[in-house]
């Protein structure tokens, strides 16, 4: 397990840069969608997949091929960039593709990952499909996972609204295109601020071995007569 301490407010405008757990965003086609904009590990904006015709069970290639959906997600990302104070206007946000990250979230449901493994709803607490650099990510960036964990414990956030009842906030099971990721966030018991995020990662030994170091020769002591 990896713990990330004090992960929020990376840009100096607070955990919730707009001051709201969820904001109503009006798109250029007149559609209104609720989004959660959060600055934790990396500035991110989350939208419910159902609100924009998306599907969190879909493989990344299918999401990439849906030009209308990708255009909507990019519009949401640009508008969030301005609302979060990361860019002065939408044109500037176009050039700043790394942040904020934009992601669709949805409730747990049966899906098949990229390796062909089936995941039952009971094995997850929610699902995510994140866009990174203009493409649907084949898993989910670690920073995006950390942001999701923080948004999950913000009452009335879009993410919180997708989580299965009874889910453990310290061990959220996230359905991603490459399988299940477990992550959790904790609050400071005194201030209520998000104090740490924990993520479980796999590991394997890459190598082991020995290093031989030469030691200086021991001094020769004079022999008694």
Question: Where in the sequence are the language-model features?
Answer:
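Non-transmembrane, aqueous-exposed alpha-helical and coiled segments at domain scale
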Residues: 1-225
